[in-house]
Amino acid sequence: MIIVTSGHVDHGKTALLKALTGTSTAHLPEEKKRGMTIDLGYAYLPLENKVLGFIDVPGHEKFLSNMLAGLGGVHYAMLIVAADEGVAVQTKEHLAILRQLQFHEIIVVITKADRTNSAQIESLIQTIKQDYSFLRNANYFVTSAETGQGISELRHYLANLAELADTQKPFRYAIDRVFSVKGAGTVVTGTAFSGTVKVNDEIYLSTGQKIRIKAIHAQNTSSEQGIAGQRLALNLNADLDRTPMKRGDWLLQNEPLPPTDRISVQILAEVPLNESQPVHIYHGASRTTGKLTLLQGKNAAKNDRTLAEIILDSPLFLAFGDKLILRSGDTKTLIAGARVLEINSPKRHKRTEVRLNFLANLALAENASQRIALTLQHNATTARQLMWTEQLTSLQLDKALAERDAVRYQDWCFNPNYVQEKTQQILTALNIYHEQHNDQLGVSKARLYRMATLNQPENLIHHFIDEMLDDGRLQQTRGWIHLPEHKIQFNTEEKSRWTDVLNEFEKANGQAIWVRDMANALAIDESIMRNFMYKAGKLGYLTPIVKDRFFLTETLYAYARLIKQIAEEKGKVSVNEVRDKLNFGRKLTVQLMEYFDRMGFLRRKGNDHILRDKNVFDL
């Protein structure tokens, strides 16, 4: 367990921790010389069944970013106030930050009790309670590092604090120091936000590389594992020259998504805010600049809780519920705290009623299952996105989906309402197509996707179409998808003509035939033959690859299977390969390949073609 100590410079934080633990948290020569904490200092108190870790955060405002690096993933804080000086400038700053980060408990410790009297101390405590409502029910301890007053009572209270660390979620660790140790190699230090890590585990650096854990020091003791809420030093199997890392990077169990530069948040205003203003954003050991924009009005008063968007100048690795500190553009003023509701928020339609209700409900949701249900109301989302946003393992995601009757297909997650909505869009689009083109048999799968649900996951919509074909809501005739009740057919004269046309295609040995050539061969007017061959195309017997040039549909499908086989074996297929396999001229081969591109079966890549949707021409 980690406990943060904060307060004004020279109010005795470091001395208090030395009295509690026997360890001085000043670790830089400059700190010892100046008598103030500049970077994060650490002390440890071994107990019977655990080790308490204390982070001594710097009190001087110049070192605020260092202070904020120590607050991520911690549930308890001690506010240090000197009895002889009371609430000072940095005390107020730290109080605001502690309130914004919403610690489970803030313990107020009055130090230097030997320098004043009990009446003055009681007056100070009452002033704090009166001025800071969130500390009225806090526990107060009166101490002196010089005389030992109150130290044992405080130590006993801290030893009995409940463990609140979330060890069940994936491991997530913010790096605040990186250095090399002779004989050991790369070492990082930081705080574990969540999860568990063990020696020899392979985890991700936030830049994407996988790294093995060689050794662990948890709470300043060699250990086989580290858990959430602990201060950890990790010896990594990584060369800093080959795998650069720095303060602000992360070590992660889940493969990270790309960092985000646009987020939706709920803020608690510390000062009156305008609709839009530049801000400095602090998260874990990271710091960047950006723009804060209110979503629910032109301004916000102090203590207002409201929805907002933050556009980051440098992207951050954020997840739902992460806490941010926002300071003014000149960094002089703490203006708000923020809780992340959504990463990669949309660029348009940010203030619609539906959108604001969605964000408000996210803020009110009590668990991941409820938030996932909200996210999946109208869209499918990848499992990887949900696992990252909610910081869940794959099994935890499956459990959350099951609680909401949601479904996971390959990497996509969706709910039954989404399936119903999209399948109805498919049926509606196909019905409109039949009304407007009643002489056409149907459409290809790729075209149906574009007609009905463009901008939805293509492989997922194809899956829905396949299910609709299986259960009879759709039918497929010679590759063309249509509604079951939609029919077109030849009359008696056309049936006879089809026999003659089919005979000509058999003579052509798999070649395409032009309308005029077929008309000449059968001594029929070209316009009549054109209308007939296009009707045969609508019935699915023939397929035009360019205007007036047709293949037998079954032959075209055979060629598609051949090309699919080549592309799957080699990863690509060229015009020359197809020309040689089919014994075509180059012009016909190019027309065939371009037709397959248009149908969504292939996609041109340089001088080759690769499979786009290998199932388009499956019968």
From Swiss-Prot:
Residues 111-114 are annotated as: G4. One of its GO terms (biological process) is selenocysteine incorporation. Keywords: Cytoplasm, GTP-binding, Nucleotide-binding, Protein biosynthesis. Residues 1-169 form the tr-type G domain. GTP binds at residues 7-14, 56-60, 111-114. Residues 7-14 are annotated as: G1. One of its GO terms (molecular function) is GTP binding. Pfam families: Beta-barrel_SelB, GTP_EFTU, GTP_EFTU_D2, SelB-wing_2, SelB-wing_3, SelB_WH_2nd_bact. Its main location: cytoplasm. The keyword Oxidoreductase does not apply. GO terms for cellular component: cytoplasm. Gene3D superfamilies: P-loop containing nucleotide triphosphate hydrolases, Translation factors, Winged helix-like DNA-binding domain superfamily/Winged helix DNA-binding domain. Residues 144-146 are annotated as: G5. Coiled coil: none annotated. Residues 56-59 are annotated as: G3. Belongs to the TRAFAC class translation factor GTPase superfamily. Classic translation factor GTPase family. SelB subfamily. This is Selenocysteine-specific elongation factor. The lineage of its organism: Bacteria, Pseudomonadati, Pseudomonadota, Gammaproteobacteria, Pasteurellales.
